[in-house]
Amino acid sequence: MSKAIKILLPLLLFSLSLQAERIKDIANIVGVRDNQLIGYGLVVGLNGTGDKTTSKFTMQSIANMLESVNVKIDADDIKSKNVAAVMVTAKLPPFSRQGDKVDVLVSSIGDAKSLEGGTLILTPLTGVDGRIYATSQGAISIGGKNERGGGVNHPLAGMLYGGAIIEREIPLDLYSKTGATLSLKSSNFQNAARVQESLNQNFGTQVAIAIDPRTIKLQRPESMSMVEFLARVEEVEIDYNRENKIVIDERTGTVVAGVGVKVGPVVVTHGEITIKITPEMSADNGAMDMGEGIKLSLNTNTLSTSGQTPTVSSVARALQRMGATPKDVISILEAIKRSGAISADLEIL
């Protein structure tokens, strides 16, 4: 016996959502970006929760560290459990100057039980070119406690807030430049054309030209510095054409969809579940309220919207309340998408 679920609503038209957005929120300036840094170090001062003595690379690292301070010892003779080998990562923001501080993430790579209470000893951080750009040292912050067990949430990774000092700058000269390039965060011909049009109208002259659906070349006016020009560019607003997207976390069943993602007329059967979206209206006064403007008729197993237009999120939540598993919800939404009743991209995590 199949279980019929009918979602009743008026017929609707689909369109991409338009909203005003600043250029700084939808585009990046090419070359102005973070750079990744990485290093290998040791965390000391652990209360017996460090790497085991069988971790040879840790014991060898301890021996090498001690030798750097004129203490010579064979790695095989080290029996300490208060030290852990870690990878240290950080992001070097654009225009960082010597002496600036950045946050650091420290992660265990051995068999340590916890980094809580430990101190990272001086660790150089290098870029992809192998050059040292920062150094890091300091006490590790693990974070909050687990409410259920009372222990640390994830004791094998921690932060050093402001724990790295910039030693080398990455040169980026804007002062002498006469041009720059904008890169839209998503490719779209309409958005690229709107950015070009809005900028040229705002400045009263041609300062922008779109060369593809993602890239806009800029030419600063002679009367402005590059910093002043880019600051003004970033504040210009356009009617941004935002494409609808549905994101589903398969592990948790979480469905995230924009408010404009609607469901059109369709009939989908998945196992014992049948979804029918039709333009007719239902008049069942005894229906159970499922939330999100959707009601369930106990007599006919029918979901109705009482004249409202359902969204993907409201349909998914109604299915979950009826006992559909995350896999069922994903399969149903995929089928609806293939039928053309959802004008949005579907992304499964």
UniProtKB/Swiss-Prot annotation:
Keywords: Bacterial flagellum, Periplasm, Signal. GO terms for molecular function: structural molecule activity. One of its GO terms (biological process) is bacterial-type flagellum-dependent cell motility. It comes from the Bacteria. InterPro entries: Flag_FlgI. Transmembrane segments: none annotated. It is found in: Periplasm; Bacterial flagellum basal body. It holds the Pfam family FlgI. One of its GO terms (cellular component) is outer membrane-bounded periplasmic space. Residues 1-20 form the signal peptide. The basal body constitutes a major portion of the flagellar organelle and consists of four rings (L,P,S, and M) mounted on a central rod. Belongs to the FlgI family. Assembles around the rod to form the L-ring and probably protects the motor/basal body from shearing forces during rotation. This is Flagellar P-ring protein. The lineage of its organism: Bacteria, Pseudomonadati, Campylobacterota, Epsilonproteobacteria, Campylobacterales.
